[in-house]
Amino acid sequence: GHLSKELITKFNLDADSDPQAYGIGIKELWQVAPGKCKPGLVQHSLGWPLDTSTYGGSFIYHMDKDRVAVGFVCALDYADPEFSPFEAFQQFKHHPSVKPLFEGGEILSGGARTIIEGGAQSLPRVEMPGALLIGDAAGLLNLPKIKGTHQAIRSGTLAANHIAEKSNGEGFDSALRASPIYKELHKVRNIRPGFNKGLWRGLITAGIETVTAGKLPRTLHNHDDFSSLTKIKDLKTIERNWVETDLAPRDRLASVYFAGTDHDEDQPVHLQILEPEVCMTRCTEEYNNPCTRFCPANVYEVVEDEVADAGKRLQINAANCVHCKTCDIKDPYQIINWVTPEGG
């Protein structure tokens, strides 16, 4: 979260931990044609349409009243600057075994957000003067189980009891690390970073770590997601063989409507570019402006501008923002700062 980022930086809470790792999750709720939904059915996938060097997968949850939730999660340490997580999600929906479920249906809502994936080795110090980090703010998601709500509840309860007993937050970091909350994360600490070397090695690592319950005397490490992009000049051509899409939403701009976010067009821009001169110079030359692709809401757009030095400029369509914060994390120069929009 925005406040967590500020607090971690101000109090140097991550001095002794690995960089946090993130994924972008995109989700849609559909009303499907009668008879297609099987309430209670849960389907998960791994890999495609991602290449084997990129970690991620998809899910389909069959609910009541002919409703289906479908989603896609992709780790933000992917290397291809031309990659678009939104387009990858749409490709998943068009897989021959998936598309029939949605044909004849309609999308009801959608959205996107970043998911903390770092686990135990990326856990920052969770206490500071006047505040404690709990739940997702601390990064307590158990990624292999895709579960975090129980961790949020347990850490909140632990924090409340600690404050009630001590009247302050001193010692909470040690208390959390000695609790079942941390032990659960430590047990699976090597599964996510095991995929840094690719899908197949990741699956082998996950199997070993699961069988040994994380008891091997080693800890794999995470790296900054923004450091993983390959420069355009070094990029090898990737044949994705993606198909034309015809299911809703037809493009990123159309998807914004279903997210339900609401901004006044003239409100202050909450996406701050700290060094604007980098965008149409170094970023264009080195990465071809990846923000125009990693954003799932078409917030960043390169437009013609005769007045601009390069004849083009980066336009920020802040009203499109769905508050996923991918830009703040994935920008290779770390010059995009997401702040809370006017009105929240």
Feature map (PLM): residue ranges:
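Predominantly flavin-linked oxidoreductase catalytic cores and closely associated redox partners
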Residues: G1-G104, G139, S155-L158
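A short alpha/beta connector and helix-capping loop motif
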Residues: F11-N12, Q121, K145-A159
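Alpha-helix N-cap/helix-initiation motif
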Residues: A15, P144-A152, T284, A310, ...
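Structured mid-domain segments that build the active-site/substrate or prosthetic-cofactor binding neighborhood
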Residues: S97, L101, E127-G135, N142, ...
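FAD-binding beta-loop-beta segment adjacent to the flavin cofactor pocket
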Residues: A112-L143, A254-H270, V278-F294, E301
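Active-site-proximal substrate-binding core of FAD-dependent oxidoreductases
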Residues: G139-K145, T157, N161-R201, D309-N317
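C-terminal auxiliary extensions adjacent to catalytic cores
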Residues: F195-L247
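Iron-sulfur cluster-binding cysteine motifs and their immediate structural context
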Residues: E285-V322, T326-G344
